[in-house]
Amino acid sequence: MDFSLFSELAINGALSGLMYSLVALGIVLIYKSSSVPNLAQGAMTMLGAYVVLAIANGIGLPMWTAIPLAMGTMFFVGMGIERVALRRLAGRPIIMILMMTLGLDIFIRATTMAIWGSSSRPMSIGISDEPLFLGPLLLNRSYVVGAVVAAALFAIFFFFFRTRRGIVLRAI
């Protein structure tokens, strides 16, 4: 194997790993702020993707407009779930909260399937499928964008957990 192929695979693998680290960062951020693992986090992410799809394809807005609108929508969905389902369980045994988040996961998946069906749907996110040429290396553009997003989220995570101001904000 020549060095350029090895470098290309190593960089694409590292960028792919950053995508997984975003998922882990979300799990850690929720656990650290609430001391409860949220078993419905994957279903909430899936619902957010379907909301983006509904806004982009249903209303016809561009993807970069649909994403912030879906984020706002999901903020209010999450706040509603917290107020209606999770807040009532504050101070209760952890198993009750885990069971509630598991039930929310099942409910969100079933509701999403009832609305949009069970087949996967293609969605263009506005990133070209053409590889990014970095000298002799070919990089996947979506991985590069993911790496930029991961770096931004790691900076936010660092701010909230390693700076005095972030720790004060978390305490509020």
Give the location of each predicted region.
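Small-residue-rich transmembrane alpha-helical segments that form helix-helix packing/gating elements
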Residues: 1-34, 39-172
